[in-house]
Amino acid sequence: AFAGVLADADIKAALAGCAAADSFNYKTFFKACGLFFAIIDQDHSGFIEEEELKLFLQTFSAGARALSDAETKTFLAAGDVDGDGMIGVDEFAA
């Protein structure tokens, strides 16, 4: 999904940086990847839901790990400004 957008080496480096459980840093992600909302929003609902967050690393590479439940909940809470359990495009870009 990211062909032509990111170099393979950059994708590998980003995945290696969060390969261990509970090592994902949502602040870094929001800062670096604001452009990728539409790709992470796999069902094209206009929102990123919990399951899409849990599995979003696999968008970069099929062999990537799923986020832990704790990482997913922290990530969702950080981006879900209005408390509806989803991250809308306006929240994602904020």
UniProtKB/Swiss-Prot annotation:
Organism phylogeny: Eukaryota, Metazoa, Chordata, Craniata, Vertebrata
What organism does the record attribute this protein to? Merluccius bilinearis
Keyword line: Acetylation, Allergen, Calcium, Metal-binding, Muscle protein, Repeat
Q: Which residues carry this modification: N-acetylalanine?
A: 1
Extra facts: Is regarded as an important allergen. On the 2D-gel the determined pI of this protein is: 3.98, its MW is: 11.27 kDa.
Family designation = Belongs to the parvalbumin family.
Keyword Repeat attached: yes
GO molecular function annotations of the record: calcium ion binding
- The intrachain disulfides are none
A Pfam family matched by this chain, by name? EF-hand_7
Please give the name of this protein. Answer: Parvalbumin beta 4
Any idea where the EF-hand domain is? 36-63, 67-94
Q: Where does Ca(2+) 1 bind?
A: 41, 43, 45, 47, 49, 52
Q: What does this protein do?
A: In muscle, parvalbumin is thought to be involved in relaxation after contraction. It binds two calcium ions.
Q: Which residues bind Ca(2+) 2?
A: 80, 82, 84, 86, 91
Mind telling me which GO cellular component terms the entry cites? cytoplasm
